[in-house]
Structure formats: C-alpha cells, structure tokens
Amino acid sequence: MQRGPFALAVVACVLSSTLASSAQALPSIHIVTLPVDSGAEAFYAADQGFFKNAGLDASIDVMPNGGATIAAVSSGAADIGFSNVFSLAQAFNHGVPITLIAGAGLATQTSPTALVVVDASSPVRTAKDLSGKTFAVDALKSITELAPRAWIDKNGGDSSAVKFLEMPFGEMAVALAQHRVDAALLPEPFLTRAQATVRSIGDAYPAVAKQFLIGAFFTTTTWAKAHPDLLKRFVAAIHETAPWANRNRAQTAAILAKNSKIDAATLGAMRRVMYAETLAPDVVQPVIDIAAKYHVIDSDFAAKSMIYAE
C-alpha cells in the first residue's frame, strides 16, 4: 500500500520521537573527581564508552581536592565522588555517612609513585639522618605525613624528632634547593619534573603496607540505598575500566593529559599508578591502621564497615 506524504510525515515524526526518547532513556549520574592519575578512571570510562556500555549518562566535574569531593557528595550536590582513602576514612570515623563503592589507584612496591627525596647535594642519606631536620608534606595529619613517619620509624630513625611542615607539592623542589626544608615526600608528576635536582632516599609507602588503596570512589549510604541499580551500573563501568587502563598506558596518558594540567611529555615519563580491579578490605585496612597508630583518628575500625554491601 502506498503511503501519502502526510502518513509518511507522521511515521517520520513517530520514529524521531521514539529515537529521541530512546536517546534520553539512559539514567544520569553526576560524578566529581580530581585531575590526578589515581582518580582518572572516570575520565577513561567516559572517553572509552564504558559508562554508556553500563547504561549510564555520566557527567563529570573536576574538584580542587578530596575534601571538596567529599563535601559535594555528602551534601547531595553530586552522586558519586573520588577521594583519597585516608580522607574518606577520617570522614567516616567522624560520622559522615559515606561508603566506598569501587577502588581506584593502588600504592604498590613495584610501581612507586611517591618517594622521599632530598636536594641532590644534601648530605642526608638515610632515615636516621633526618633527626632534627625539616620534612615537607602537602598536608599534615594525612597519608603524606604518616607514611614518612612510619618509614622513618621502621628504618632506624625517630619521627618524633623530625619537624613536618605543610607545603604545596609544586613548591617542594625549590624549597629543597634553597635549603628551606631538608626532605619531602614528592609524588608524581612533581617527582618527574624535579628529577634533575632531587635525589630519592626511600619509598615511604611500603612502611604502611606492601599494597594499599590510595583512592576510591564513594557515595552516601542514602544514595546507595535509593539507587541500587545506578550503583551497580557505575561499579560495572569502573570494573571494566580498571583492567583496560592497566593495559593501555599510552591511551590513558593521552586522556589524562586532556583532563588535567599534566603535560603529555611528563605523563609519558612519570611513574603511573596501577588501578584496583576489585575493592577488598585488605587494601583499605592499612590506611585506617596507620591513622589510628599515629592518633589521627581516635580509634581503629574494620575497613569492611566502610565498604558498600548490598
């Protein structure tokens, strides 16, 4: 049967409407993350279509620090966020109703991404040499202070005899060269940028554990209970992303360069994190334990209690 122009127009309109509705059918989630290697999986998942594969329309906003992402998620301004596990453990310990839903960057002995450094001309060679010295960290009472403390104490030094100073990572190499500080914990990409002027004297993170989670994706317990399907889809997307990212370093470097202030040359040269392909309590517990040991949180607790369980 031949259709007239009007009938064809109606069919076209219906098809157009159906396609538009189909295109709008993906549920949306709002993610907040940081422009850093350890938290870059959201960028990779968006770029490679892993969120769409999981049936999600994901919008991503970049925040200045982990505290800002925790504030955004806990206030309801965002659905899911990325932050460092140390800050998340502190927030959880203080009663903020958050839950970890997927792992991100791992600290491992095989791929160290932050080292204890001194100026290249410094006489400091060992942890013992740091007694009476000044040590720069980006934040006091954080993993970047406690890991060096543990490293000093485990290697014949006394961390109580070391003065820790707060300083932005970007200023540390200059401060070392000017002898304003004696040592620093310098992570990537700052480590690669400063390699001509600094010398490593140790890897502090293994003093916490052979392997532990640097960062994780999280949400509130309220959002998790209200949106179990969206949560499953997000976790599925990240679980697809992690092994892909671990295998495709050149592609991840290019994606991260587009979403951060780290230039492609530095990304190509620097040490990169490995991404956790599962979320297990045993890679979270060391962070909680070190915080309790150095009295940054008032009591130790089981990592399992802050990991989402259906």
What residue spans do the PLM features occupy?
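Bacterial N-terminal signal peptides that target proteins for export
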Residues: 1-9
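Secondary-structure end/capping motifs
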Residues: 224-296
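Short, glycine-/small- and polar/acidic-enriched structural segments
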Residues: 25-155, 166, 182, 188, ...
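Sec/Tat signal peptide C-region and signal peptidase I cleavage site
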Residues: 19-25
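Sec-exported extracytoplasmic/periplasmic mature domains
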Residues: 47, 74-75, 93, 153-157, ...
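Pocket-lining segment of extracytoplasmic ligand-binding domains
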Residues: 86, 164-165, 170-255
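Conserved C-terminal helix/tail region of periplasmic/extracytoplasmic solute-binding proteins
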Residues: 291-310
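Bacterial N-terminal signal peptides
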Residues: 9-18
